[in-house]
Amino acid sequence: MCDNTANLIKARYVVTSTSSEQALNWQALQPELSITELSAEKADFWSLQKHATKAISLFLKQPRRSLLVLKADDQAEYADLLAEFIRQEQPKERSVFGVNYVVEQGDSFSFPRIDTEPAQSLADNFAAQGDVLKALHADQFSLFGSVRVHPSSQDILLTPGLVHQANGGVLILSAATMLSQFDLWQRLKHILQTQTFDWYSAHPFKTLPCDIPSYPLNLKVVILGNRTEIATLGELEEDLYSLADYAEIESYYSVAQPNAQENWANYVLALASKYELDLDLTALNKLYQLLVRESEDRFLISISPLKTTEMLLNAATLSQKQTLSAVDFEQAFKQKNEQHGFLRERTYADILNEQIYVETNGEIVGQINGLSVIEYPGTPVCFGEPSRISCLVQFGDGEVVDVERKNELAGNLHGKGMMISEACLASILELPSQLPFSASLVFEQSYGEIDGDSASLAIFSVLVSALSDLPLPQNIAITGTIDQFGLVHAVGGVNDKIEGFFTICQRRGLTGKQGVIIPATTIQQLSLSDEVVEAVKNEQFFIYQVEDIYQTAKILFDRDLLEEKEEYAKGKEPIARLIQNRIAFRSETPKKSWLDFFKS
């Protein structure tokens, strides 16, 4: 997204009640499609894959390239779509490829003899006509054929494999098969490099019953795999990309422009029509909002046929209707949330029952509610949860103790965020290189491993509170990562984080003062639930967007962080002055007179 688009979003949706507060308007919390009417035109999946279709077409036309590595996530679904697309690209009239193996069986006095002759028709045993075949699971016999010997008569039977059946055409395989049986890849690579099929014994200690002639194979292979599988294959086969072309089936589609939104809508309507379903404009808009929640980007949404079809069928099954509206998709979304919500509800119950202490009212020095995302192994969902972060300060040798890191309960990214917060604070306040205080920072009642730097803005704020002895509002939770210059940057999971804190506040009772602080750069990630939107609309809950630590300090403390004017009213002094005065006071030591020397 270009800077102009980002600035337009901010200008449109920010409501500035004072110079320091930047509360988002409720319209900013859910994205809206710009299309106003539905088109009768339908679009297929490949109409949204201009890069992949061009790469595949060039690969099919290039006679000297026989291998294409194609990144694809939903391989089973994409294999069917890919095979159909390639068939449409192939010429309608195709020649017969391959050979006919003529087997002269042996007897007790002679060995069997096998010869080849050019295939004349598809009736010949190793004839093919340029078919497009796919096999996401294969072994050496299904892929390369087999040589069978009758146990009694010793007659030989040659059985063609997929490489023979796809001669003159295209064979679609999976990278997972190549990785699990790497010897298949080695033999397939040899076939593609030599354009010849050679027979080998399947048993390492037995030879073939007789000589079997090789024959030429005119074969193209497409290997489908996700990014991890392809990366592993590339590590095992260093020459992979000298042998293969590379392209990607894109899992996400940019809908930044109105014509792209229309293309996406036509694609969804085409998918729905396969199941005799129809969608009105509100349904398309709600589906778009749900996809934005998953991608965390209102300009880039998933176009996975598997995922989109699942959402369509879930809404249709639950509503028992053929024409779907926004209500049906919202109902399906809530049902799925409830279905996956056991651990989330238990966590929230612990907070509400004060088994986990999270304050949502009042003010406390050196304590803030950070926003985090919780993931449990064995579950497909994650959810937002407020985390109480506390800080105690003693004037000492400058050590800032990260209790989580010290006890090996935090990862490297968390440690990085902590160090950036310290460096930023020292730089902004012009403190000496050796900080004149010691501090301990704790994620209270956190018993599992934590990682990520999205709490660095919260850590900075709680350090400032403890140093200045200024209380922090407990009704405002915060997320964001900062750099050493104090700029606030984007984090992930913003929708889950906001909804997690909102749920706790809502169940305790909204006061009209509660809210969250998020980075301004995360506005395009927002696609919040209807409950949050309604609360913001009624001014019961607020979402503040900030660009730097100065705006953050203004919201949290209602003070300037640094000196911005010559005079300040009593009780409104800048935070930096309070911290420096406190450090100076603590640093002063009583002077001794020369008489004290004789008294000691």
Where are these regions (language model features)?
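A short helix-to-beta-strand connector/capping loop
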Residues: L217, S242, K537-F541
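Peripheral, non-AAA+ core regions of ATP-driven protein-machinery
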Residues: C2-T18, L24-L29, K54, F59, ...
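Short, surface-exposed charged micro-motifs
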Residues: S390
